Amino acid sequence: MKRIPQAYKLILSRYALSLLMLYITQVVFYLFNTELFHIDGFSSVWKMFCGCTRYALSSLSVFLAPYLLMSLIPLPFKSNKIYKAAENIFFYLANIFMMVVNLIDTGYYRFTFKRLTADITRYLGVGGDFDELIPQFLRDYWHIVLTFIVLLSLFVLLDRLIRRRFSAKEEIHSAKQYATRSMVFVLCVALLIVAQRGGLQTRPLNLMHASMYCETQNTALVLNTPFTLYRTFGKPTLRPKHFFSEKEVKSIYDPHITPQTSTWADTLFASPLQVGKTNVVIIVLESFSAEYLKTYNTTGTTYTPFLDSLAQHSIVFQGLSNGKRSIDGIPAVLSSLPLMMEESYLTSSYGDNKLGSLAADLSKQGYATAFFHGGYNGTMNFDNYVKKVGFEYYYGKDEYNNDKDYDGNWGIYDEPFLQYMVKQLDTISKPFVASLFTLSSHHPYSIPAQHKGKFPKGSMIVHETVGYTDYALKRFFEQASKSDWFSNTLFVITADHSALTSQEEFKTQLGLFKIPMIIYHPSLKHHLVSDMTMQQTDIYPTIADLLHLKNDIFCFGRSVFSPQQHYYMYYTNGEYLLLMDGYLSKYTEGHSLELYFEKEDPGLKNNIAEKYKDTAAKHKRFTEAFIQQYNNNIISNSTHP
């Protein structure tokens, strides 16, 4: 060690410090989100640590590259003060950035259950109100801000000690020294390339490799946010797939369908619903887990007395979301388009593609179409999206035009906005199809002053606002029931995605995506609670079925009343999850498929793919056909009838 030049000792020590800080932020990430992960024993921890190190070295090789290259390259003027200052600036900027994004994800992860990726920049760009929310986030997550201050102080202190210990002028006095240091420079560049690639394997390290070190639920502990950001930056969103011929893929899975209502579905109503006579209202609740309803959580406390009472007169399915963000949930509900790529569809390069929707189909049948959301106009590009898919009218914060009901963060409180919606529906022509996306049950979970203390606070911060939104829905239905259009209106109530949960049943791989799925009509004769799953993408074809719509539709779902194969599909970090026939499979291209019997093994501990080879083969075949249809239709702009 004594023969190693001081300059190299300094570089190695600073590199080790950067690695240490990345490790610490990973530990902080886990400590703040412990309840979201399940770790079994030391062997699991060790395996995850090895994977974590591999991803950490890849991140360091990218973000420290400017500092390392400047420090290692043999130049005669490296002792210049300006040059040294530039080295230090690059070193500090890289480390501060890595700490900041890892700590931001510490708070943000519990809302999306995935590490931040490069699409976050476009997501924030269409948020419309992000700048105004920064002070609120800093207040609510003060503990993360404090953690950053402590870690930054520790980092600065340790770096000063390192520089004091290994400070020395770097001078090259001979051609031999220059040659030696040039070889060291070339060697280090080669090592950086290997580290960035994650090793010498054929393909570079990517997000999917994290599943080699742990269960899918724990991959976020192996990954780090600096890696997921740089690895997804500038990448093509989708690639064409050719697992099967065009004829064969359609025989396995075809997104072009013709609605076919079963006779028994018609018998549930006083008389069959008909297109041209039945109004449709789709209510999408913000951040609403199935756990909040007694209808789904029979052992827990209910925070939704109205929804539970409405469910007693409705058709209830086991709802599952196709994404974890609002920007992904709305297209899944309205256009039957799930999230099957790293970037949100609405902010991707495909965002201008033509999409089908129930609104577009029903507008051809003479329906008026309207979308309601009390948030800022332009939020997540919803106003442009709904117009593109056939909604004629958009009612947002601007149209509401009364800031006395502004919540100070996102938009108009739910109760007054839902009353406003009833008034607007009274005025538009009939029949109509309308969709509502609520707002209040979202961080920072504020409710109007006059309602504080009225709703149970529960065990989680979200519970009080869930009670408020439930109350807003009650007032909406009370007012709407006085209108002529109410008696002939089909209501579908769901959520954009799930949110905070406390019970183990709702923390499993599947439980994290459980949302309400309630179908109500005043003429409904039979209350029904089904064990059948209904994903967000099933809403469009299900309504088309119930209304006896005759035209073909394009969708990545199936009517829950049709005899077609029912399934649930979800994508995260390169892994496709398929629930079909009671089995849950996990598919990653190039890897062996995993298969689990979900009801008996909700924690997905026992891979039965080898035991049930036919079922595993069926799941693989279906998943690959789905991927091919999804990718190729989006790439070719064919996601419409």
Spell out what each predicted region is.
Residues L19, F49, N95-M98, N279, ...:
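A generic hydrophobic-helix recognition signal that picks specific residues
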Residues L205, S523-P641:
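Membrane-interface soluble catalytic domains
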Residues K2-L238:
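Transmembrane and membrane-interface helices of multi-pass
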Residues D140-I144, F148, H451, I608-T615, ...:
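Residue-level recognition of alpha-helix termini/interfacial anchor residues
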Residues T34, L64, F113, K294-T295, ...:
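Short, function-defining helix-loop hinge/capping sites that tune catalysis or transport
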Residues R197-F554, P563-H566, T572-G574:
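Soluble catalytic regions of membrane-associated enzymes that act on cell-envelope
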